[in-house]
């Protein structure tokens, strides 16, 4: 296992990654250690942002932002106990259960998303994992969205062997299955699903040649070490995810995490920067929690290497800035949709 200590010592001077060879060395290394990511997170803010922006420019259009839209195609009634989730059946959050949407309803939503500028359409379902009849319905939805010329993504929970292949055959481009947090902190948030279940599902997705969308949530009461552990785990996947959504906890009344102290927004920006440095080719997505961020914090996230957002006024069951707000912010910052 190769350590990043030599690279991090160079980072202290604020010049790391101005040399492309260092970025190549970083990307080709097999693993990130938690201690090394924690050292990144502890850098002076300006140095960390500079390094992240330098890496970002080596691999991406510096001013391009990919727009994705997320739709809940089956809402509420989930049997899991994820402490952050308003869709868990055991919590009283006011979320109404909704049966899986029809093909016509999904096509209508996807058409609207495309007209608003989205290039990727993600469909989420609140269950532990899909049954075969659910997979068959999802393949119809995926094919219909694909026919509109959009990239397709689905987040359906734990996949059984063979299910990912069916989704791939229907035209699925990305499968989302987040790790949520570090292995060490995981048990504080979820007890009904093992961490290994998540890794096994990611293996199923990779085995079907579907692109991986995998990230986590920060602000759940975890330590900086735990945030470093999440990023190290993601960056050490082989290969690391093509898409990395970083969520800022949205506290929903009725969930166990409601009312905990909020994470300092600058710590969220640091997490974005560390994700960019450790996974240079990935799309790093600002996901849930943007509505509670100022425009200035969002701008810092883009500077730190975020180059994707969820676009639309709702993410599953939680609020999101509306498309007009986002369009105005992108224009203000001189950013453009990819």
Swiss-Prot record:
SMART domains: BATS, Elp3. It catalyses: (4R,5S)-dethiobiotin + (sulfur carrier)-SH + 2 reduced [2Fe-2S]-[ferredoxin] + 2 S-adenosyl-L-methionine = (sulfur carrier)-H + biotin + 2 5'-deoxyadenosine + 2 L-methionine + 2 oxidized [2Fe-2S]-[ferredoxin]. Belongs to the radical SAM superfamily. Biotin synthase family. Residues 63-290 form the Radical SAM core domain. [2Fe-2S] cluster binds at residues 122, 153, 213, 285. This is Biotin synthase. Pathway: Cofactor biosynthesis; biotin biosynthesis; biotin from 7,8-diaminononanoate: step 2/2. Pfam families: BATS, Radical_SAM.
């Amino acid at each position: 296992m190769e350590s990043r200590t030599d690279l991090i010592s160079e980072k202290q001077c604020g010049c790391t990654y101005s040399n492309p060879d260092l970025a190549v060395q970083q990307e080709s290394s097999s693993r990130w250690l938690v201690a090394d990511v924690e050292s990144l997170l502890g850098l002076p803010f300006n140095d960390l942002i500079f390094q992240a922006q330098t890496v970002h420019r080596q691999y991406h259009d510096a001013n391009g932002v990919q727009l994705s839209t997320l739709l809940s195609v089956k809402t509420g009634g989930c049997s899991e106990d994820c402490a952050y989730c308003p869709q868990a059946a055991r919590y009283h959050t006011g979320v109404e259960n909704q049966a899986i949407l029809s093909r016509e309803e999904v096509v209508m939503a996807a058409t609207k998303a495309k007209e608003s500028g989205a290039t990727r359409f993600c469909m989420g379902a609140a269950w532990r994992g899909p049954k075969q009849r659910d997979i068959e319905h999802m393949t119809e939805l995926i094919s219909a969205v694909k026919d509109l010329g959009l990239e397709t993504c689905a987040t359906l929970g734990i996949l059984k062997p063979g299910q990912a292949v069916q989704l791939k055959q229907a035209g699925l481009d990305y499968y989302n299955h987040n790790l949520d947090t570090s292995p060490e902190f995981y048990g504080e948030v979820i007890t009904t699903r093992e961490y290994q279940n998540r890794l096994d599902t990611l293996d199923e997705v990779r085995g079907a040649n579907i692109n991986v969308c995998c990230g986590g949530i920060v602000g759940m009461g975890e330590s900086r070490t735990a945030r470093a552990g999440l990023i190290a785990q993601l960056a050490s996947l082989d290969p690391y995810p093509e898409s990395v959504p970083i969520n800022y906890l949205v506290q929903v009344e009725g969930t166990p995490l409601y009312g905990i102290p909020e994470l300092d927004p600058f710590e969220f920006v640091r997490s974005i920067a560390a994700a960019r440095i450790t996974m240079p080719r990935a799309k790093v997505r600002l996901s849930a929690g943007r509505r509670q961020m100022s425009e200035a914090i969002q701008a810092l996230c883009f500077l730190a290497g975020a180059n994707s957002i969820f676009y639309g006024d709702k993410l599953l069951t939680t609020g999101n800035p509306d498309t007009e707000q986002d369009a105005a912010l992108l224009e203000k910052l001189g950013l453009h949709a990819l």
